[in-house]
Swiss-Prot record:
Residues noted as binding ATP in the record, renumbered to the chain: G30, S31, N32, G33, F34, G35, K36, T37
Name of this protein: DNA replication and repair protein RecF
Keyword DNA-binding in record: yes
Family: Belongs to the RecF family.
The organism of origin for this protein: Mycolicibacterium vanbaalenii (strain DSM 7251 / JCM 13017 / BCRC 16820 / KCTC 9966 / NRRL B-24157 / PYR-1) (Mycobacterium vanbaalenii)
Length: 386
């Protein structure tokens, strides 16, 4: 798989750019702040409908513009698919597949399968559980695009159930049974959608675990062994996940039971205390949790191992995913650079950003595309250096 064409309109610092890309290695070279990472971000957005840098879409739209457009042509086993994404702040994104509108932007998921390595990856180890949940859900969605709808439905249930909890707390003291009966209905929705999401995550963790262990050993052969496991606030869910069980019906029953037991606490606090939105992917080195105990080098090795494991899972399922490397070589020591370069050598397409040529492995035969900035009527914009 490779991206043959990338076009951006009013995306971040790019007013307009069209790039013809090729299989093999391409390096975008430019000073920090010149917009090279924005190219990688646009490709990642096309692959996942999310940014690796910001949580909302508003920053993706160039100042003064109403919307941003990301267009790609992806080649997979000789077949071309064109994807156009219209990004508008505060409204649902619109998408076209081979120039025909689709009902939901989620329908383009799976067209571009990519794995991203970025400086932000350290947050996978050192950050909040939300970073690791996002890693699991993005990878699960890349492999099985229907999971995006499961996640969207679950998030909607959590929002509506949280709003109900805030009002139902007072209703309980007034003896209003209607609000509590409505809460029971939403408990069923949360358990149903939550069980599907947990099942997808647990299946993924089961497949990821041996790949993470192997990748970490490659990156840090003298270090402690790496391991991952799914953590849940529901004891039954955690125990079954640890045993490799991903049965949806069992998870649904466990969630319903936990919701029943935590009802008073939820009404008291007005928040959802049960569900996969509170779960975590635990990363371990030897007998210690990586977060808080891993050194800087160990943290980088663990973060890279998670990405390399994702790449391997996607690769064995079909064609190689596109490798996106955003300024990571500058962050790594020589051993980790060499291990990452080894994997990149086998990929069908690798797209890399670097501030200076010296950040790229010397032995790489790669196409260089220079990125610079210039003044325009609308302010400073990124351009390809000619």
């Amino acid at each position: 798989m490779y991206v043959r064409h990338l076009a951006l309109t009013d995306f971040r610092s790019w007013a307009r750019v069209e790039l013809e890309l090729e299989p093999g290695r391409t390096v975008f070279v430019g000073s920090n702040g010149f917009g090279k990472t924005n190219l990688i971000e646009a490709l990642w957005y096309s692959a996942t409908l999310g940014s690796h840098r910001v949580a909302s879409d508003a920053p993706l739209i160039r100042a003064g513009a109403e919307r941003a457009v990301v267009s790609t042509i992806v080649v997979n086993d000789g077949r071309e698919l064109a994807v156009d994404l219209d990004i508008t702040s505060g409204r649902a994104n619109k998408a076209r597949l081979n120039r025909s509108p689709v009902r939901s932007a989620r329908e383009i998921l799976g067209v571009l399968r990519a794995v991203l390595f970025a400086p932000e990856d350290l947050a996978l180890v050192r950050g909040d559980p939300g970073e690791r949940r996002r890693y699991l859900d993005e990878l699960a969605t890349t492999r099985r695009p229907r999971i995006a709808a499961v996640r969207a439905d679950y998030d909607k249930v959590v929002r509506q159930r949280t709003a109900l909890l805030k009002t139902a707390s007072g209703a309980r003291y007034r003896g209003d049974r209607g609000a509590l009966e409505t809460l029971d209905v939403w408990n069923g929705h949360l358990a149903s959608h939550g069980a599907q999401l947990i099942s997808a995550r647990v299946q993924l963790v089961n497949e990821l675990a041996p790949e993470v262990e192997k990748a970490y050993q490659l990156l840090a052969p003298g270090s402690r062994p790496a391991a991952i496991r799914y953590r849940s606030g529901v004891d039954v869910v955690e125990a079954e996940a640890a045993a490799g069980n991903s049965d949806e019906e069992m998870f649904e029953a466990a969630l319903l039971d936990a919701l029943s037991r935590r009802r008073d606490a939820e009404l008291e606090r007005g928040v959802c205390l049960v569900g996969p939105h509170r779960d975590d992917l635990e990363l371990r080195l030897g007998d210690q949790v990586a977060k808080g105990f891993a050194s800087h080098g160990e943290s980088w090795s663990m973060a890279l191992a998670l990405r390399l494991a994702a790449y391997e899972l996607l690769r064995v399922e079909g064609s190689d995913p596109v490798l996106l490397l955003d300024d990571v070589f500058a962050e790594l020591d020589s051993a980790r650079r060499q291990a990452l370069a080894q994997v990149a050598a086998t990929a069908e397409q690798v797209l890399v950003t670097a501030a200076v040529e010296e950040d790229i492995p010397a032995e790489w035969d790669a196409r260089r595309i220079g990125i610079t900035m210039q003044d325009s009527d609308g302010g400073r914009i990124s351009v390809v250096r000619t």
